């Protein structure tokens, strides 16, 4: 889910978790999803201040540079992107051209950092577990939680990627649940839990505390870790994890072209 967050008292806005469409079979990218965001930005006359990533996504490519070139904004992510870059720089055997210092991004956020979207005040929570670099952006009374909490009837994000940790995710979720009960929670994905036929993306901290099927009603950490570990062992890798990681750890840029002018994505065999 991509969000556009607008200051009601000005045209200032931010884009959170953009998508570049990608067809694995043909190796072709498509900007349809990003162009819908651009059309909305232009129709509303928005002044984009930020293009934010909650983490290095493993299931879709980021359109951050495409959006930045067309509507502006600084690209931001958590400072622990360097951990992800080091981990997957080795997985994909990246050469020295691939910088592992996060310099591909305009801003590296740390826990407690603040930022502004016009008159809106934002602050950063470091919420690792799904990945080491996951952030939650708390903007006034809204929390954009990425892949930590999902809708209460679906639960929580997986933790079995390299650098993931069920213990860390549980602790991160407690940090989110410590926000005021009325805080609006905007999730990064929705999968329509069994018995629900429509997509949903907004809930509240109070609803999550009371109703989340994985962590609600004060479930202890050891029960959560056991459940999450057993559940993750049954999950297949996301279909786009290999292309997504190579692009997203570069802030949405493609790997450099080879001497024939073509850009390639690697497939490490028997690795993930």
Question: Residue locations for each model-derived region?
Answer:
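Core dinuclear metal-dependent hydrolase active-site scaffold
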Residues: 4, 111-139, 178
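Divalent metal-coordination and catalytic microenvironments
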Residues: 5, 17, 55, 67, ...
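Active-site HxH/HxHxD metal-binding segment of metal-dependent hydrolases
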Residues: 13, 21-28, 32-120, 210-211
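Active-site neighborhood of phospho(di)ester-bond hydrolases with catalytic His/Asp-centered motifs
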Residues: 16, 47-56, 75-79, 126-129, ...
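Accessory terminal helices/loops
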Residues: 80, 171-184, 188-272
């Amino acid at each position: 889910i991509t969000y556009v967050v607008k200051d009601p008292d000005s045209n200032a806005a931010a884009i959170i978790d953009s998508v570049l469409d990608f067809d694995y079979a043909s190796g072709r990218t498509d900007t349809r999803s990003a162009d819908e965001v651009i059309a909305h930005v232009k129709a509303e006359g928005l002044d984009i201040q930020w293009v934010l990533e909650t983490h290095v996504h493993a299931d879709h490519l980021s359109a951050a540079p495409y959006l930045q070139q067309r509507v502006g904004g600084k690209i931001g992510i958590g400072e622990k992107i360097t951990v992800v870059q080091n981990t997957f720089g080795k997985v994909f055997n990246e050469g020295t051209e691939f910088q592992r210092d996060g310099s591909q991004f305009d801003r590296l956020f740390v826990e407690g950092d603040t930022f502004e979207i016009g008159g809106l005040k934002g602050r950063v929570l470091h919420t690792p577990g799904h990945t080491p670099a996951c952030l939650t952006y708390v903007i006034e009374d809204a929390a954009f939680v990425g892949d930590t909490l999902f809708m209460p009837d679906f639960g929580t994000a997986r933790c079995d990627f390299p650098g993931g940790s069920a213990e860390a995710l549980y602790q991160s979720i407690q940090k989110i649940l410590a926000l005021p009960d009325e805080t609006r929670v905007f999730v990064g994905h929705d999968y329509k839990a069994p018995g629900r036929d429509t997509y949903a993306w907004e809930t509240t901290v109070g609803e999550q505390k009371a109703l989340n099927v994985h962590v609600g009603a004060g479930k202890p950490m050891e029960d959560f870790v056991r459940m999450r570990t057993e559940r993750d062992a049954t999950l297949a890798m996301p279909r786009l994890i290999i292309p997504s990681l190579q692009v997203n750890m570069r802030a949405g840029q493609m790997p450099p072209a080879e001497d024939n002018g073509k850009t390639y994505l690697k497939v490490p065999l028997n690795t993930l």
